[in-house]
Amino acid sequence: MLFTDILTMVFETIGTTFLATLFAYVLGLPFGVLLNVTKKTGLKPCGWFSTFVGLIVNVLRSIPCLIIIVICIPVTRALFERGTGEWYTILIPLTVCAFGFVARMVEQSLAEVSAGKIEAAKALGATNFQIITKVLIPEARASLVTGVAVVAVSVLGYTSFAYNIGAGGLISGIYTYYTRHTGDYMSSILFWVLIVLTVLIVQGIQELGMFIAKKIDKRKVVK
């Protein structure tokens, strides 16, 4: 395995994690907002709609990632003219896997916003849309950013299934190396280098998420 191969794995892992997380938030953020707004104590309570959206989210969360990958192969093949063999062929399955998780994370983050601030906005005549865009999301932004980091780490973990469709990445590379060197893989420096690189990426995501969250968190701590 050459240095260029390792570099390719790193870029595949980072690229796949970033894009899948981005797409999952594009889809999951609106659903998370809807879950929060339409619940019993939300801005616009709607029992049947909240139940329906929640059912979609829960069903997607309950399907194992590997099964979703298999189900999505026809869709991936239709879009990319191939269902397996390249790093981008796992983007759609990873997005679907993370979508439900994102929706629940967003719902939870918005639920942390003080009811008093929402009531104050209502008293000032703000519409529901204005409350969502100018109160709920801005007030929950630190929690939302932390959620992004958590989701990104989970998505990176999902890339372990990339091995099953030849989609590449560090975790897939680690398992491939193991299958080809089952007798001496534990004593191989390369094997541990791949593991260390994976850990560094995970730590980088977590630290970046915490750093940004602290920077944008405007809440005052009372001593």
Region locations from a protein language model:
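Short helix-to-coil transition segments within interhelical loops
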Residues: 110-140, 167
